[in-house]
Amino acid sequence: MIVGEEVKTATQGEVIGLFLNERIPRGLSLEQTVAEIRRQGGLVYVPHPFDRMHTVPGYEHLLPILEEIDAIEIFNPRVAIGSFNEEAARFAAKYRLIAAAGSDAHVAAGLGSVRVRMRDFDGPQEFLESLRDAEIHTKSTSLLYVQALKFLETKATPQGARRARRARRVRRAMRKS
């Protein structure tokens, strides 16, 4: 089992720490979050790096920490526009980063959209070596699929519906002010 955490940074989206021992506080800068992952001896994994539909670290944030990135996600089925995944694959190839993929499943229906076949490993370094040689198998996804999953996870439950209504009220109030 790999203990990891997806951490929301202050303004540059999310970064995943793998092989962690402690929780990492939310709201740190990207650089501070990466430093905290490293302090714990963890690996730095950048998820959905060019999904411009969400807050993500752009080139200006990734290039300064390039040496600290252990793996970068080149396929995420929840990315609404396929070219964002393609851009991540080009970035990984250009900078010789280890390519990874994840289902980013927030609901059970999203499981199995990506499979990463890799040999057994023991510890962070063997994990990286195994991931470098891994086979990534993906299922194509459509914008409709992504939006349906998003609906299921945010509005199909009573709590999700309440959150969505509250968010709409806040947006309307902000537009009026």
Model-derived segments and spans:
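Charged catalytic cores and adjacent phosphate/nucleic-acid-binding surfaces used
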Residues: I2-V3, V7-I24, Q32-A35, R52-S177
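Phosphate-handling active-site elements
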Residues: G27
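Short beta-strand/loop segments at the ligand-binding rim of alpha/beta enzyme cores
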Residues: R39-Y45, P49
